[in-house]
Amino acid sequence: MHKLRHATGWFLSALFFMTGGCDSVDPKASSGVDRESEITIYRDAYGTPQVFAESNYGVYFGFGYAVAQDRLFQMEMLKRTAQGRVAEVLGSDYLTLDKKLRTEYNHPIVRRQVEQLAQSDLDILQGYADGMNEWIERVSDQQVVLLPKPFADFGFMPSEWTAYDVATIFVGSIAHRYADFNSERDNLEFLRAMELRHGKQSGWALFNTIKWLTDDDSPTTIPRSGAISHQELIRPTYLTETRELPPLARTVTDSAGRYAGLSRGGDGADRFKTRVAERGYLSHPEFSPASNYWAVSQVSDAAGMLLNGPQFGFATPSYVYGIGLHGGDFDVVGNTLLALPSLLFAHNNFLAWGSTAGISDQTDEFWLTLNPENPEQYWHDGQWVAFDVWPERILVQGEEDVVVKARRAKQGMVLAHDPAAGLAVARARAWEGKAVQDLMTWVWLATESTLEAAERRLEGKTTNINMYTMDRDGRLGYVHSGHYPRRAAGHDPRLPALGDGSVDWQGMRPYDDNPKVRNPSTGHIINWNNRPAPEWISSDLWSYTWSRADRVHILMDQVEAVRGATVAEVVAINERSSFEDVNHRYLMPLLQAAVLEASSDEAAAVALLADWDKSWRVDEKGFYGPAPTLMEAFVDQLQRQVFLDDVGEDQYYRFAATGYPNQPLGASWGTSVAMRALVHWLDEKTAGKEPAFDLLNGEPVEAVVLRSLRGALQKLSQEQGSEMQVWRLAAAPMEWPPYNFRGVPQADSDNVLSLPGYQNRGSENNVFVATGEGIEARDVIPGGQGGHRMTSGEPGAHYDDQLKLYAQFGYKPVPFTRTDVEASAVSRETVMLR
């Protein structure tokens, strides 16, 4: 289908209310797949669909059909974002984004993976696509009634879906977003700046002080059980040969969240640095993989329970979609990211599962020397080798097509190609060519019934995701899934490597190396993107080096405090942890030691922080109280006192943000780069080690802390007066903007939901309870199952009907059996197949 010049009307996300009890349609059947005669979709009071059919194709047809009813514009733009086809409908403002997406990712290899799928896998993707297309055909015939308002406002029609399209929304949302982060060029830029500032030896020491690989004191999901080996950090000899590499082209968004260009070229770099300095790295989707999870076996009133909070971010429509699938090989209920065909947080009454971002290192960048006589060749294994090259044609609304070259070296896709400088940069990805396998592994996980079978199944997962399981008897399982490379000796994974073949990857590590555990002796599994196991090294990601300063301690302490408690008491942890200060536990001992001989004002300030409940709850006027106000000011001063003189003004943007919710936050809130580095440095001193670089310039830590506290007190007194009890800090609202993780519109610009203050919790929260006989479920998915407005501008059904529930830490039940589904249903729709 093509563009619509003057489309009007609005798609009613819950059309079944209008069509009565049995509205029949007659979609076209695809060849080679048996079809049942009908599919039935029930919806409850929140609009959550439950699909009943006889085959895998049928339930996935119903899945796609329901998604199209609820989220058609969001899914259209997700598909275009994943494939780099945004400019085709939104114009040249998105051309730079499309160029990036079309040249940095290997789209042909995804298509080949889909073409090579077994028929059982293809039935699932094709069923989903056919269901989407059936609803789109209806929309095309009844635009005034059914077309979602954003299509009319942006002036184009929804496009047809294929099995390939369904695969790409997974690849774009999981592999491209959660398994492709890389900071190696950022790290190299910082290292070189520090070597220029301090000399080669001290600069290298400072780099290792900020970006280490292993911290013995960092909390782990699998408990420590012995000594930890350390990789010696030796400055790679090839760094002396490495020329200046082109900076990474990261997405830049405006204050509303809309795509505003790339960080390479124009004013994009300055805008990116300003945002990071103000809001911190966790405000940017390329640095903020997040989510939390805790599971406890043998609670007092159940066999076990889990609570998952995937922190995808907050957007309208929601990043999360709830559904039940019943038929063929599937009998499962739950929810998933962006209506992906794999249910990420679900149960089948035998087994429940969930996930968090693993944040392990699956990518490396290699710098390549170009042939000065032919820049389409690079030096590898002693000879000039030609890139694999293919054209990518980008359609641009209202303008001529643009053709760009996609290149691939032996290591991976080429992200930068600079003939004038004689170099290129290629990125190796452990999951490249296997992302569709990752999708199907997750899909078929829903058919497993034991921890052991699930663990075997998860060997097929290729992206770095923490996977959790719980059976109906409350037994717990954990696998740090993904494929991880064998790196050559001398390859520092924090920095770009030589691409001449000397340090290419040497295959993949065996699945036995992946951290995993069943039935841990602790009786619980807890994760907030912390280190999976003691021997597992940190990735190169600048914003997330594993340290003792880790927010997961909040969950660990609270789970330990309610050991043997009820399900309700374990669930209540979610509310407390959503507001708890992430730095307090590390800073209070320093403050109390620093004010032993301090003035009464300083002692009063420390007492204020010591008596504080550590909660960042906003008051009725939209402000935080005296203690959080002081804490934010103190952290700001402390980070400045410790790091500014060492790194300089031009690099301090990397350390400046306190990460507190007085600034708009992204998917989550955690300890800052500066705080992790400072705590790690102090831990080494406490352990009797002499750090290679002195962050405090010979001063006692007490003196630096006291000076920072005095600076905070002086600043607040000048701004708000000397009476501490009246100090206030304005809260940034918690917003659900209408843009996806690339800044692409997924709703109209006025579709913004908000709450007065930030909650450090999942984009959804789900609770699964093991009863011994089955699994009970409840969840909450704000704003709602829908997310678009009517032509009049009024919200449609299920636009935001879970937002209040979410704000109050409430949950809605998720029925499983057909009897319970029918009992809770407020509508039923039957789709006839032929």
List each language-model region with its residue ranges.
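Bacterial N-terminal signal peptides that target proteins for export
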Residues: 2-11
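C-terminal motif of bacterial Sec signal peptides marking the signal peptidase cleavage site
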Residues: 18-21
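Bacterial signal peptide processing site
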Residues: 23-25
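Substrate-recognition/specificity elements adjacent to catalytic centers across diverse enzyme folds
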Residues: 30-305, 310-316
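Second-shell loop/turn segments in exported
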Residues: 60-62, 109-123, 426-428, 439-445, ...
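Glycine- and hydrophobic-rich flexible loops that cap the catalytic core of alpha/beta enzyme folds
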Residues: 327-337, 342, 346-351, 355-501
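Hydrophobic alpha-helical segments
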Residues: 423, 463-562, 615, 630-633, ...
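Terminal end segments
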Residues: 541-602, 694-834
